[in-house]
């Protein structure tokens, strides 16, 4: 498979995985031919890289959890030591026009996801006093935020669920802050613990502004597998790109440009279905059976999405 060769060459020459405490993580791999392998453990990043070059998986994941025995298949015997707090913001969960109209990677939808990621980081730092350890462009339609501070590592699923409810404003009632005074409505604000007055004000004016659209299943799962930062997303061919918080203030086009790893050359793609739409930086208009010469990164993306097939 041509795409697999591209992946292998990238991992051999450029791979740089960004993982803390690799020796305490469980790893999982999904291959191009199908199937997933879990419960793999590595002592060093170099050992992991050697394995990846040899096997060339389509997807690479590591556990949010730290284990005494990460390679143990029995979850009860792994020896759970704690887990990072992981937040997944994905275009699939955003009810915006840009994200609804297409399930492919679009700049407009990523802008919406970036705005949501910035909102989350503001709440984590401003209201909860938590500093993200890592911010990652997922390589697809969103962002992953990792928090690794000691006080969150041993939170159980119940506590993480309560945090999810707080971030998603479950049970928030705007009417609590509005009273009638004659014919007028007066909005009352009360400074609450955590300093979230500004978010309350926004929520009273527009309840949707209070809610942060995170994937709740990801955050509350203390054994969650998350895509390895620095690996290629096997759905798109884009890099799961580690970012600084300052990067989230930049145009999303700059983030996507840095995540494109197959920048050189062109490839022929035969479309297996009629397709019209925007993909990454390009507009595509093709009928089933059409053959087009495309930039390598775009042809790889479309094959991974099963829209076409690369051929020599």
Curated annotation (Swiss-Prot):
Keywords: DNA replication, DNA-directed RNA polymerase, Magnesium, Manganese, Metal-binding, Nucleotidyltransferase, Primosome, Transcription, Transferase. One of its GO terms (cellular component) is DNA-directed RNA polymerase complex. It is an enzyme of class 2 (transferase). The active site is at residues 88, 90, 215. GO terms for molecular function: DNA-directed RNA polymerase activity; metal ion binding. GO terms for biological process: DNA replication, synthesis of primer. Its EC number is 2.7.7.-. InterPro entries: DNA_primase_S (IPR002755), DNA_primase_ssu_euk/arc (IPR014052), DNA_primase_ssu_PriS (IPR023639). Transmembrane segments: none annotated. Its cofactor is Mg(2+); Mn(2+). Belongs to the eukaryotic-type primase small subunit family. Catalytic subunit of DNA primase, an RNA polymerase that catalyzes the synthesis of short RNA molecules used as primers for DNA polymerase during DNA replication. The small subunit contains the primase catalytic core and has DNA synthesis activity on its own. Binding to the large subunit stabilizes and modulates the activity, increasing the rate of DNA synthesis while decreasing the length of the DNA fragments, and conferring RNA synthesis capability. The DNA polymerase activity may enable DNA primase to also catalyze primer extension after primer synthesis. May also play a role in DNA repair. Heterodimer of a small subunit (PriS) and a large subunit (PriL). This is DNA primase small subunit PriS. The gene is priS.
């Amino acid at each position: 498979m041509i795409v697999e060769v591209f992946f292998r060459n990238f991992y051999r020459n450029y791979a740089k995985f960004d993982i803390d405490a690799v020796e305490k993580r469980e790893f999982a791999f999904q291959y191009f031919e199908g199937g997933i392998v879990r419960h793999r453990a590595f002592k060093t990043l170099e050992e992991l890289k050697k394995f990846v070059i040899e096997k060339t998986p389509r997807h690479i994941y590591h556990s949010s959890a730290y284990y005494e025995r990460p390679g143990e298949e029995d979850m009860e015997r792994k020896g759970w030591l704690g887990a990072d707090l992981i937040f997944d913001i994905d275009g699939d969960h955003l009810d915006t026009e840009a994200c609804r109209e297409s399930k492919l990677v679009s700049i407009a939808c990523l802008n919406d996801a970036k705005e949501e990621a910035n909102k989350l980081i503001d709440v984590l730092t401003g209201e909860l006093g938590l500093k993200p350890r890592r911010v990652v462009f997922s390589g697809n339609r969103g962002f992953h935020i990792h928090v690794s501070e000691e006080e969150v590592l041993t939170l159980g699923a119940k506590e993480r669920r309560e945090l999810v409810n707080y971030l998603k404003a479950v049970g928030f009632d705007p009417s609590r802050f509005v009273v009638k005074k004659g014919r007028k409505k007066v909005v009352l604000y009360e400074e609450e613990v955590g300093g979230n007055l500004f978010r309350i004000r926004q929520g009273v004016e527009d309840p949707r502004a209070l809610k942060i659209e995170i994937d709740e299943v990801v955050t509350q799962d203390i054994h969650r597998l998350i895509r390895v930062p620095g690996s290629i997303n096997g759905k798109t061919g884009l890099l799961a790109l580690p970012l600084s918080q300052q990067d989230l203030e930049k145009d999303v086009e700059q983030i996507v440009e840095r995540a494109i790893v197959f920048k050189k050359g062109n490839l022929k793609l035969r479309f297996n279905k009629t397709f019209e739409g925007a993909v990454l930086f390009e507009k595509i208009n093709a009928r089933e059976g059409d053959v087009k010469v495309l930039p390598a990164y775009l042809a790889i993306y479309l094959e991974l999405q099963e829209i076409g097939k690369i051929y020599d």
